[in-house]
Every structure is written in structure tokens, then in C-alpha cells.
């Protein structure tokens, strides 16, 4: 049974039957509207965020399976502050603030996609992304929060989230 895999990025709940998805699906003999509706149903919870979607199609039976990944780190951070797009000038124009608990929650959601081996490393990675798109954390530049993590200021908070990190898939 030959299978074909299609990987695309869609806005949660808003996949469209146009190119490049529609023509690819119709070439494989699938009902484009049906597949797009199913993609929109399974990605609806990520409305407004870019979500990776993988469609595995059995060429002989025309059966397909849709797998939804975790939205991009940038999408999750922007959603957390209710912003539509990153700052065009992150060094001078800040677009929102998150607390470290929110960063830890996002790190746990992203664990399967992150190369970080520890929660602390994952949080530091997310802090770097937050800084690059104009988000402050705990009211400060994320670079300063990284220094405070290294100094042990957030050890209690990190310890509280370690169990969730260890239980998360990845």
C-alpha cells in the first residue's frame, strides 16, 4: 500500500481548498472539500495560529489520516498576549508581557518539538524567541530573566513545573 504524505502549515480552523493544498489533494483523487473541512475541524482549537498539519494518504484505498502538530513557538507566544504579529522593532517597541508561568506552560506544550533536554533549557529558548518578537517577561527584557534564572531566582517555580515537564511527551 503506497502512501503519500503532505505536510502543510495552515491557520487553525481556516484551511482553504485553493493552492497548494486543493490541487495536490485532487491529483490524489480525494474529495478536497471533505479533507479541508476535516482539517478545519481538527485545527479549530488553534484558531488564529499557524499549525503544522500532516496528511497521510493511502493511494490504493484513498483513505487518509490527518495529524496536527503544535503551533509554532511564535504563534503560541503571540496568542498568549493576544497579539496578531511580532514587533517590527523588538528592541524598542514591546507588544506585550508574559509571566514565567506562561512561558513554562508553553515550553511543556512544545516539548516534543524542542531539542532542549531540560525545562530550564526549554524556557531559555522560549525567552530568546520572546525577546526577538518584542515580548517582555515578568516586566523585563527576557535576557535579564535568563540571568535571574541562572542566579536561582526562579528555582521554586521551575521545581513546580519540572514534574509536568517530565510527564509531557517528547
Curated annotation (Swiss-Prot):
Belongs to the universal ribosomal protein uL11 family. It comes from Sulfolobus acidocaldarius (strain ATCC 33909 / DSM 639 / JCM 8929 / NBRC 15157 / NCIMB 11770). GO terms for biological process: translation. The gene is rpl11. Forms part of the ribosomal stalk which helps the ribosome interact with GTP-bound translation factors. Part of the ribosomal stalk of the 50S ribosomal subunit. Interacts with L10 and the large rRNA to form the base of the stalk. L10 forms an elongated spine to which L12 dimers bind in a sequential fashion forming a multimeric L10(L12)X complex. GO terms for cellular component: large ribosomal subunit. Keywords: Ribonucleoprotein, Ribosomal protein, RNA-binding, rRNA-binding. It comes from the Archaea. The keyword Cell membrane does not apply. It holds the Pfam family Ribosomal_L11_N. This is Large ribosomal subunit protein uL11. InterPro entries: Ribosomal_uL11 (IPR000911), Ribosomal_uL11_C (IPR020783), Ribosomal_uL11_C_sf (IPR036769), Ribosomal_uL11_CS (IPR020785), Ribosomal_uL11_N (IPR020784), Ribosomal_uL11_N_sf (IPR036796). GO terms for molecular function: large ribosomal subunit rRNA binding; structural constituent of ribosome.
Amino acid at each position: 500500500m503506497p502512501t503519500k504524505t503532505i505536510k502543510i502549515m495552515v491557520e487553525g480552523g481556516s484551511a482553504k481548498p485553493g493552492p497548494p493544498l486543493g490541487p495536490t489533494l485532487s491529483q490524489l483523487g480525494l474529495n478536497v472539500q471533505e479533507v479541508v473541512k476535516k482539517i478545519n475541524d481538527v485545527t479549530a482549537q488553534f484558531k488564529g495560529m499557524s499549525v503544522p498539519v500532516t496528511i497521510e494518504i493511502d493511494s490504493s484505498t484513498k483513505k487518509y489520516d490527518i495529524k496536527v502538530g503544535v503551533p509554532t513557538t511564535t504563534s503560541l507566544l503571540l496568542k498568549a498576549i493576544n497579539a496578531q504579529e511580532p514587533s517590527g522593532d523588538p528592541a524598542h517597541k514591546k507588544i506585550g508581557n508574559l509571566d514565567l508561568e506562561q512561558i513554562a506552560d508553553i515550553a511543556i506544550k512544545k516539548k516534543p518539538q524542542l531539542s532542549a533536554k531540560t525545562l530550564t533549557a526549554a524556557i531559555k529558548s522560549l525567552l530568546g524567541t520572546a525577546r526577538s518578537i518584542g515580548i517582555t517577561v515578568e516586566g523585563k527584557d527576557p535576557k535579564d530573566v535568563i540571568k535571574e534564572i541562572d542566579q536561582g531566582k526562579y528555582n521554586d517555580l521551575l521545581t513546580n513545573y519540572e514534574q509536568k515537564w517530565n510527564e509531557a511527551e517528547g
